[in-house]
Amino acid sequence: MPKHLSPEQVAAYERDGFVFPIDVLDADEVRALRGELEAWERDRGAPIDFPEKSKSYLLFDWADRLVHHPKILDAVEDVIGPDILVYHSTLFLKEAHTPAFVRWHQDSTYFYLQPHLHVTAWVAMSDATVQ
């Protein structure tokens, strides 16, 4: 029995290789996490960028809390099992009206992990529309 996902969501992941949306954070949690990121940016006087954007969970308590969030881990466990390791994490901040985007891709091409049993948990921390 899945811990967080429905049996239908697990089946969709197994069939399609992805499943969305998955509710894991409430509005207060998102506000708090984003607030800590924005406070760091204000203190620094610039938006977060590399190298801090990569593996940020090693640098920031708020990012560590996010990658260890029980609902995220439960959803991941539902599709790959309980042996979970955070291998990589990148913050991708796309402000409104900017041309930034990420093309459809498969991380296994770049990570060289065997077996190819890994997932990406994309967590939105702002409202977004189709437009």
Where are the regions a protein language model picked out?
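Non-heme Fe(II)-dependent double-stranded beta-helix
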Residues: 1-16, 20-113, 117
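Extended, low-complexity, turn-rich repeat/linker tracts enriched in Gly/Pro/Ser/Thr and Asp/Glu
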Residues: 127-131
